[in-house]
């Protein structure tokens, strides 16, 4: 298996300090969750040691579509119906603040170019328009697009433009988080698999393996199951066709074009 596209550019990750003895928190997992956790804790003054079985961002955090999107998996109008208007608004505003914080930390790993969510058919168009109406009613920045430019013209009956979304270079982003965590005082241990909680010299432990079963807490392994998708990257195309991330079929098909004109496309069936 070759090197994943997003990880092909990665520099060495700084190891940070080497803590002796017991640390305040051990973080297991060197993806976006683990590195974010390590950064936040170390910046607050905690002695942190992060363990990664392979290398930083080598899991799902470095192998994905590279989208940075506001909101959750549920359409906003459905979230309003199930959670209530104020709770839904609060959650969506939280994700907007998260994107702002990401922009502060990510540098050139995040480009705020917006995203376009396309309706595959009339049924999905109705779903997207209901979400658009709910977002507009609650004061969120969003635009409805009826006429799409080439090469999309005539293929999709409508779309929502989310202007605050962005395109993410995920491997670079997670490595940048790791570097900031190290600068804040976190110790990073790559190529260090954790086989047992008993071997961790820490007051507290954060399991940040996300979709990958760690075996450390069997109850969690039963609750979280990984699901595989596919992402491919082309050679550079002759021209820029897609200036922002695009996704359709309720998020199961997605693509974007990078500044070097490569097309990165993925999906799940």
Give residue spans per PLM region.
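N-terminal Rossmann-like FAD-binding beta1-loop-alpha1 element of flavoenzymes
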Residues: 23-50
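Glycine-rich FAD pyrophosphate-binding loop
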Residues: 43-63
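Glycine-rich nucleotide phosphate-binding loop and flanking beta-alpha elements
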Residues: 34, 195, 212-214
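Dinucleotide-binding Rossmann-like beta1-alpha1 core, especially the glycine-rich loop
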Residues: 71-147
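Active-site substrate-recognition segment that forms the wall
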Residues: 68, 106-111, 202-269
